[in-house]
């Protein structure tokens, strides 16, 4: 009888390294290890050798960077999706793509089960499993961290040593870190106290604003229909744009975020994020929208941005609601074409200028000089009609 096969989201860390052996023993199944590359900087060489030596029957490395930028990041940027007005959703955006890649490999490898290494109190378990349910509803999902016998990192290390599983014996960082090209999330350790300022060693890529260059960096970003297409006049692929802005913004201390956020599972958590490129691009994109979108569209889209952010954060990317919102967002982005000039300086992003062939700013209407073309006399009748409802109400209900 052929063994069942389990597709495992594999990072090469302690949890997923011992998970291969644990899953094989518990389910008598072969384990297919899958790693997705979303632009993380951590070492990915040697993962295949490590996975196979640990007991995986096969290993799949899937390069997802281009798809991540074009089909996920740009959609979120166009929508203006910032969870609770702060978080650019780097980790949350990556999870549905990783889960989809897992399902694709699982089907190719004839797997009947999907496994992940998410904890039982975090958001990622929801994101993975809701995506699995959307794309592979008949596959069984395994979450070893919710059921296995290990209660500490030390007990996991003991298991690894007992079964000759190669794991790092260097001092573990006190922080839990997740990284991709759109940003880095940092939690745990002293960061769990919301009154403790993040130690400098918690940050992975950004320069401290105090130590950033004394000379500001000026950068120009061009957009076409809401999507960045060039930096400082140089046309670039999306991946290169993000890499370039990560470099420029990080060295100027831009992109450090500290927030208390509401998790999917009902608790509040303190999160530190580094998102240099995301911070710059969201700022620039929003300013270009101010210039080009009609008032009611601009204001209504701010509500949609929160709905879109919640969809990403809550793990319902593969939903009809997200598809429907994409249609609205794409229509709003047709005039969001132009250039935004910014100054990056010691942790701050400052707007220096913006222009667009679809600008709704009319200087002749806005000016207070003799070039003013606004009909001032029209204001009197407008104000009478605009305030008529309140005037009528006040006549019936006099102010006390």
Curated annotation (Swiss-Prot):
GO terms, molecular function: argininosuccinate synthase activity; ATP binding
Subcellular location: Cytoplasm
Pathway: Amino-acid biosynthesis; L-arginine biosynthesis; L-arginine from L-ornithine and carbamoyl phosphate: step 2/3
Family designation: Belongs to the argininosuccinate synthase family. Type 1 subfamily.
Keywords assigned by UniProt, alphabetized: Amino-acid biosynthesis, Arginine biosynthesis, ATP-binding, Cytoplasm, Ligase, Nucleotide-binding
SUPFAM superfamilies tied to this protein: Adenine nucleotide alpha hydrolases-like, Argininosuccinate synthetase, C-terminal domain
Residues where L-aspartate binds: 119, 123-124
Pfam families registered for this protein in UniProt: Arginosuc_syn_C, Arginosuc_synth
Keyword Cytoplasm attributed: yes
EC number: 6.3.4.5
Swiss-Prot/TrEMBL catalytic activity: L-citrulline + L-aspartate + ATP = 2-(N(omega)-L-arginino)succinate + AMP + diphosphate + H(+)
Binding site for ATP: 9-17, 117
Protein name, entry field: Argininosuccinate synthase
Assembly behavior: Homotetramer.
Underlying gene: argG
